[in-house]
């Protein structure tokens, strides 16, 4: 089985241009492809993870990845799939985020002489002259076609700014530049990027008279069609300081039964034959598959030691309902107490079990918070310092998410 057929079997491919040519190219290890990452935060997320694993799979098959850091396009903001305009970041923020991305990518992709390369589109986009850009590529874009593009659909309903409207042109120009200066002949991206990617292949065809290729990755959604990679409204980060290895493990351990095999196929490097065996499991036996999924992904992102710790902690907590040394914990300080007490709402927000005080109130009202073995029923519930003595107090959200508070 070639790498193209494996990507198909794993359910990773959504749309492609020139399928037979792409199949032949990637199976022969002759593709030089790029995937772009806009620097909207100081860490990559679980949402980026599938793109990183795709780059790794294709590199292992002999193809050369180009990791494009969007230092320039981030200054505009990608409107794809958005109902609001993205927050404008400063150049300093974008440069800092780009450095964070580079460090994280190096854990997945093999960079170096003759291997993967990393580029930043700020190096060419920030120096563009507007008049020269219009003269060079403006005639290659149809406004009518751009307005019909799916990537602008939701923003058109709320009001698409001219700033965002230029994003497709900038992304297309990236492909044009990479094709000319780096020999990059293929672009990969999320399925919501299809229109932008076609803009790039068309620009190359019209300006250079040559073929370039595009292929989109299936978006990682759950059985209800919602994008995966968030918990309690917060992103699941690859940075261990933003999402602990234990919380990362727990996110994947708690996926719905209907999603576990799909996640194995799309995100792990487990052999398809092994995944097929897990697919035979039903009922409570599916927990074995979930544990395997969580372990594999935690090992990929955080290493074997952290995966082992997370597995041990999760088993201890679920089996005994007790305290594990590797359970996520917060040491409370004097600043957290008012008149010697701390509120249940503050505990939920401090532990990130709830993304906001409003969400914390809703969680308590819906009976979703336990402190020790007792359900917290009052939104004004408080705890005195004595509650956190010794091994501390374990707070539980729902059935599966734990956090320990100590002094």
Question: What are these model-predicted stretches?
Answer:
Residues 79-95:
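A charged helix-plus-loop insertion that forms the helical arch/lid used to bind
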Residues 10, 90-91, 97-218, 222:
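Divalent-metal (Mg2+/Mn2+/Ca2+)-assisted nucleotide/phosphate chemistry catalytic cores
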Residues 51-58, 178, 196-204, 297, ...:
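Buried hydrophobic packing segments
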Residues 77-81, 128-134, 226-232:
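Short acidic, glycine/serine/threonine-rich loops at helix termini
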Residues 204-407:
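Conserved nucleotide- and phosphate/pyrophosphate-binding catalytic cores
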Residues 21-79, 187-194:
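N-terminal catalytic cores of NTP/NDP-binding nucleotidyl/phosphoryl-transfer enzymes
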């Amino acid at each position: 089985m070639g790498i193209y057929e494996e990507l198909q079997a794993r359910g990773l491919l959504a749309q492609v241009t020139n399928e037979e040519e792409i199949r032949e190219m990637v199976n022969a290890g002759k593709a030089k492809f790029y995937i772009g990452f806009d620097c909207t935060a100081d860490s990559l997320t679980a949402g980026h993870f599938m793109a990183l694993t795709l780059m790794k799979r294709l590199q292992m098959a002999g193809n050369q990845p180009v990791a494009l850091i969007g230092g320039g396009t981030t200054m505009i903001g990608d409107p794809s799939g958005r109902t609001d305009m993205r927050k404008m970041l400063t150049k300093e923020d974008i440069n800092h985020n780009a450095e964070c991305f580079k460090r994280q990518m190096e854990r997945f992709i093999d960079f170096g002489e003759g291997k993967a390369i990393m580029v930043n589109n700020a190096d060419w986009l920030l120096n563009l002259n507007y008049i020269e850009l219009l003269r060079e590529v403006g005639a290659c874009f149809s406004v009518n076609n751009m307005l019909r593009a799916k990537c602008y659909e939701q923003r058109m309903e709320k009001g698409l700014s001219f700033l965002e409207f230029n994003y497709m042109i900038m992304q297309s120009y990236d492909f044009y530049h990479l094709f000319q200066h780096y020999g990059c002949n293929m672009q990969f991206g999320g399925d919501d990027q299809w229109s932008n990617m076609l803009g790039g292949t068309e620009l190359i065809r019209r300006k250079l008279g040559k073929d370039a290729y595009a292929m989109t990755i299936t978006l990682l959604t759950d059985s209800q069609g919602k994008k995966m990679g968030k918990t309690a409204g917060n992103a699941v980060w690859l940075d261990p300081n933003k999402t602990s290895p234990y919380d990362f493990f727990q996110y994947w351990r708690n996926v719905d039964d209907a999603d576990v095999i799909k996640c194995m196929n799309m995100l792990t490097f487990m052999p398809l034959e092994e995944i097929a065996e897990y697919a035979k499991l039903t009922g409570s036996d599916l927990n074995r598959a979930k544990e395997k999924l969580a372990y594999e992904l935690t090992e990929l992102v955080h290493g074997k030691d952290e995966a082992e710790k997370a597995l041990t902690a999760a088993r201890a907590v679920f089996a005994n309902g007790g305290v594990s040394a590797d359970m996520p914990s917060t040491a409370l300080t004097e600043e957290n107490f008012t008149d010697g007490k701390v509120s249940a709402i503050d505990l939920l927000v401090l532990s990130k079990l709830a993304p906001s005080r409003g969400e914390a109130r809703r969680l308590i009202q819906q009976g979703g918070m336990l402190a020790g073995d007792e359900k917290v029923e009052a939104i004004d519930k408080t705890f005195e310092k004595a509650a956190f003595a010794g091994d501390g107090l374990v707070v539980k959200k729902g059935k599966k998410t734990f956090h320990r508070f100590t002094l």
